[in-house]
Amino acid sequence: MKIVDLHCDTLSALVDKNESLLTNSGQYDINRARQGHIGWQFFALFAMPKDAHWVLRNILKQVDKFYDEIENNAAYLYHLKRYQDAIKPENSNKIGCLLHLEGAEAIGTDLEMVSLFYRLGLRSMALTWNNRNQLADGISEGDSNGGLSLKGRQVLKEMSRLGIILDLAHISEAGYYDALQYYDKPIMVTHANARKLCNHRRNLTDDQLKALAQHGGVIGITQVSEFVKESGATLNDLLDHVVYVTDLIGVEHVAFGSDFDGSDSMVIDDVRGYSILSESLQSRGYNNREIEMILNGNALRIIKEVLK
């Protein structure tokens, strides 16, 4: 069964190491993704928040790398820009690649930059990484209670108008609830877990999970070890998060978001390991329909509802 993976940091790693997506030294490449049953992949553009011009240059280098890899590996990949791309028969044996921006420092406060990145192929965006920027507070700002700025609210409206998926991973708790108020389409939290099972700031509280469900959203359960369990995280611990969240808000709101190449410590070592997810979910009592929803159906629903 094909899988949608909602987050990997492979593009920035490829640029840093001057490596290829076909095969490389990281946690994710085409050869292993095919073994791992990946059908659709969100590829993050990410640069550590620094000088705005430095960030923009680095993000644009990653956009260029994305297009190079799509062109050089056209037998295996296609650029996913609309839902229809995901279901075309000629794409059935390829990986659909959706371009995502992790942290909007490259956008700044210029609304035209949102439209420009859309023209460059961007279809998903998180307003922040961990830090505060001109649009919102990130999760590392602690108890500042800072949410969205006025410009952040305007950016959300522009994203909705264009058809760009909103990702609320990394945003502050106040920003999370602000975003649900000002973005009028279903949202994603592309890589996070349940804070009730692992008390990490990047994980979602029960109230956040319930709010996500009320807005028709989807969370990508992630296998970064420190988000799964304080120490000694295993596959069973990862599956515990799936079970907890589906029990709390329903199976229709759960997917997977690996964060491959974003952390050295993973429950699943590399993307090949995704091949065990279907069987693992079955072992926890999920039926075939529910497994398909978790592995691809829920994420594809958001893509269908948001992308134009």
Map each language-model feature to its residues.
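Extended, charged catalytic domains and RNA/DNA-binding interfaces, predominantly
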Residues: 1-218, 226, 243-246, 253, ...
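Soluble non-cytosolic domains of exported or imported proteins
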Residues: 24, 236, 268-272
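Conserved active-site loop/cleft motifs that coordinate metal ions or position small ligands
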Residues: 42, 220, 254-257, 292-295
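Short acidic/histidine-rich active-site segments
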Residues: 223, 249-271
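Short, glycine/charged-rich beta-strand-loop motifs at protein surfaces that mediate ligand recognition
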Residues: 228-234, 263-268
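Active-site/ligand-binding-proximal alpha/beta "capping" segment
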Residues: 233-251
